A protein has these predicted regions:
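Polyanion-binding surface elements
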Residues: 1-13
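Arg/Lys-rich, alpha-helical DNA-contact motif
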Residues: 2-5, 27, 41-138
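Append "Primarily bacterial transcriptional regulators
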Residues: 6-7, 20, 39
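Residue-level "edge-of-site" marker
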Residues: 20, 33, 66
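Glycine-centered, phosphate/nucleic-acid-interacting loop/turn motifs that mediate DNA/RNA or nucleotide
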Residues: 24
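Beta-hairpin "wing" of winged helix-turn-helix
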Residues: 27-34
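Minor-groove-contacting beta-hairpin "wing" of winged helix-turn-helix DNA-binding domains
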Residues: 34-41
Length: 138
């Protein structure tokens, strides 16, 4: 598959695709006799993985290390290191998801109670009487 087809399939820019290869986030891609990149299924899997992990916030550095390890001769130690990288990234993603869920829950709470809160403020002369202790609400 040629670069333009990969770009369309994966919904990424040519610059991003070239950058991934340049920095080592994906393994080197084979080229045809004219020097054009030819992507195989393995390359597409790497691009798909990298795109999704980047969207999830995984660092370029972690992806470079993961790819570097993948290109070494296979042994249990290398595979354990790769799995460790993935586990660490999953932990970080779960922490970020918790923060996002907490923020979403707070926003939903504020939206659900907004009219009532505004009514209390409008009915009172002192705004401080109506300060809600959001950090205690759980």
């Amino acid at each position: 598959m040629k670069t333009k087809e990969v770009v369309a399939l994966m919904n990424i820019s040519q610059d991003t695709l070239r950058y991934y290869e340049k920095v080592g986030v994906i393994p080197p891609v084979n080229r045809d006799e004219n020097g054009y990149r030819i992507y195989n299924d393995s390359d597409l899997n790497w691009i798909y993985l990298v795109k999704n992990l980047r969207n999830a916030g995984v660092s370029i550095e972690s992806l470079i290390e993961f790819c570097r390890l993948a290109q070494l001769p296979k042994n249990e130690n290398i595979q354990a290191q790769q799995k460790q990288i993935l586990n660490k990234q999953l932990e970080e993603l779960n922490e970020n998801l918790k923060k996002i869920h907490d923020a979403r829950d707070l926003l939903q709470y504020k939206i659900d109670n907004y009219d009532n809160h505004i009514a209390k403020i409008n009915a009172s002369d002192n705004h401080d009487d109506n300060v809600e202790r959001l950090w205690e609400r759980k």
